[in-house]
Amino acid sequence: MTKTLHARPSAATDTTFAPPVITGTATEDALEILFHALLDVARRHDPELEDVLHGRADISSFTPEMLARALQVQGIWFQLVSIAEQNAAMRRRRHVERDQGREALNGSFAKVLAEASARGIGPQQIHALLKDLRIRPTITAHPTEGKRVTVLEKLRRIYLVLRELELPRWTERERNGLMNELRDQIELIWMTGELHLEKATVEREVAWGLHFFDETLFEMLPEMLLSLEESLAQYYPDETFEVPPFFQFGSWIGGDRDGNPYVTASVTRETLQRNALASLRRYRDGITHLGRVLSITERSLPVPETFRSELAHMLAESGDARAIANRNPGEAYRQFLSCVLRKLEATIARNKGARSVGPDYPSADGLINDLRTLEKGLADAKCGALATDIVRPVRRMVEIFRFSTVRLDLRENSTRTTKTLHALWKLRNGDREPPALDSPAWKDWLLTELARPRTPETSFEDFADRLPDDARETLATFALVGEMRDTLDREAFGAFILSMTRSTVDVLGAYLLAKEAGIFLDTTGTEICPLPIVPLFETIDDLRAAPAIMKELLGIPVVRRSTRWQGGVQEVMIGYSDSNKDGGFIASNWELYKAQVRLTTLGNHLGVPIAFFHGRGGSVSRGGVPTHRGIAAQPPGSIQGRFRITEQGEVVSFKYANRGTAAYQMELLAASVFEHALLSEGNGNGSRAEFDDALEALSGASRAAYVNLLQAEGLVDYFQAASPLDEISLLNIGSRPARRFGAKSLSDLRAIPWVFAWSQNRHVITGWYGVGSGLKSFIDVRGEAGEALLRRLFRDCRVFRLVLDEVEKTLLMVDLEIARDYAGLVEDAGIRARIFGMIEAEYALTREMVLRVSGDSELAQRFPQFSERLRGRLPTINQVSREQVELLRRYRSETDEDKREAVKSALLLSINCIAVGFGATG
């Protein structure tokens, strides 16, 4: 039964915001509480907005200032709705686990291992998987996150208060106190403001990323490993498993130089130090807590001799044994922890650049060993439960996060690395012009330099001052790797990502820069690069070339030696964003799939496993799909327990802002990798010759239609006029410019603003354009047999089913009437008619063909939760979109600076509101 709160008036459909409709699902109570709390705040600060929230106000007559306030309150409401939905999802998962057992919970280790055990998968396969398991979600700032850290903190508090309000134990007075706190937090968000008043800095982005570790990840990731251990014990009770710290986080924040001039070597150094301090301070808190709770006296529990011996060594090393013993007489475990704490404090001081005042921990390994000693000391004293429940979580935390919190990747564009190599060439060849990049002479020079022994006379420091600033900066960043690995933590760095890799020489060039910067190691007379060099293949042409490039690369001795030293696995990154921008949705997904199949086959042939790093964004257009289904649709054999993925912007906030959601999302990711490795690796689904042939044909036809639009005369002019493309940069939500190298061409526009702007103007072409033409062409050529084959693909081929499902969801976000309003901003009538006409026709065709293949009568029939959630938000999003069209028109034409500034504030809030409403930006 549906319950409607604040029913929307039937009149004024296009000029009022829709009030919330509460559907009687698990979100009902939370939504009602939040709506009334927001109403109370509105009445207190801006009574006119009460009518806006009730859907009674005609906003078309609002001044820009009043419209800005209305948009702000609506944006706050969308964020509160998201909190209520997360809260309800958490409650549903608890109910399932309580009523049916954990194995009934989708995305849980218990469900995967229950099925594995039932299928007869033995413990040896589990042991082998645990040995190879490597999962690393990698946080990127990328300009897609509109929430400020201070707002994130308040939203988290609202989430926690909602959880408290679920409990029946409160008196009326206590419940009123919680309600007051809820209103206070909403009021603080109201007064804080949603917009960044200044351009984001890398330093602020680093703080944003670390916020999620402080709030949730430091605590919840060890809990996730415990969940796996419990499930293994339940379904393989006769086997003992050692669960390694296989799940770690990576980061690009402070290391991603691609197109961001603000990420310098000094910024990267500061980032590494801040990352280290975040983990060290957390460990200090953990050790301090252990010292408080482990109040065990020798009178009540004899201390094992082996532990007493370790304590004596620690006390002697501290140089202050008497003071420590006198402070905690007869409390051996507290004395031990006092020694640990002193070493940790000295490590923190060293990290800050202060002179060490005593022994410290050169690396995380020392702290891990000391915590193991403490665990063993408790276990030997018959306090194994205390060791497991109290000490082990802290030790697990250190094993996972070490002294770096995250493994920081460095990323640079191949254009920049090539410029640096050219500078080196000229330095050593009397300013002669270097050979062409595709010439044998250039490759020969790279190989010769890589083979040349490095001597003190050729050290980077000796010739740095003769290089251009850009080249010196690039080499300084590489040099930082050696410095920080020696002084901070050997796992402080992840890899060097070479974006826009187009050839073998691009990658060899990165190896040479690493050598020139002095980070190569000499092992038994042969040099290796300790930093993994990871090629990033982004465009469709580059994805097609990837197998040949990697085959040649892995045949080069220095590359092969380095890969072997790094663990024997070669990582390859594949980009979803640029391949989509390059060729459209079907072509991008199919080329990514084929590249993985071919690279996996190549790696198996060469005896060098290929591990894939998936460069996905938050939106469907940039690879954002449901975690479980996205992993299940990867080619058989392509994961093998190794999985990396980027987590960007609003995706990070959604997944990791709250502990319950973070725990679920991390287990979902890890369990999905488990499932693919244990239950799907031998599944040839979707790779049969008939299916491959069909997908190849669909890819070609859909890409042709998509490229036809990209090449249509006037598309760039249309896009800039009919979307807030240029205005998005005013949001100040990222430190990185929207365009690489300051160019103004479509090809150089970053994929994020490309997707962001098309979603704002309700065309959303990046998630569907060309699909209808591809499907129609296939049926036109192959007739009834072709249509039947498409239906079999839809039923049996995971990758095709995933693509079509996501296209269908995207089509629900499109509104052609609103899109037509945006098109009205294009002054050239010919361009407007031509481009919008193409989009309108392709939309109708895509909708028709998707329904024809799926057999459904309406879009998203198979996704009732998704469609219900979206349809509940669309009336308000639609009205904000209509207002945005007028705001764009006024902002672009207004000449009075004060009036233009007022319009700008409302315009930026409209962009933010639409993004929050849809739950995605770029």
From Swiss-Prot:
Record: active site: 142, 581
Keyword Magnesium assigned: yes
GO biological process, one term: oxaloacetate metabolic process
SUPFAM superfamilies: Phosphoenolpyruvate/pyruvate domain
Any one of the GO CC terms: cytosol
EC number: 4.1.1.31
Reaction(s) catalysed (UniProt annotation): oxaloacetate + phosphate = phosphoenolpyruvate + hydrogencarbonate
GO-annotated molecular function: magnesium ion binding; phosphoenolpyruvate carboxylase activity
Annotated keywords: Carbon dioxide fixation, Lyase, Magnesium
Enzyme class: lyase
Sequence segments annotated as region (Disordered): 1-20
Cofactor(s) the record lists: Mg(2+)
Function noted in UniProt: Forms oxaloacetate, a four-carbon dicarboxylic acid source for the tricarboxylic acid cycle.
Similarity annotation: Belongs to the PEPCase type 1 family.
Name the UniProt record assigns to this protein: Phosphoenolpyruvate carboxylase
Designated gene of the protein: ppc
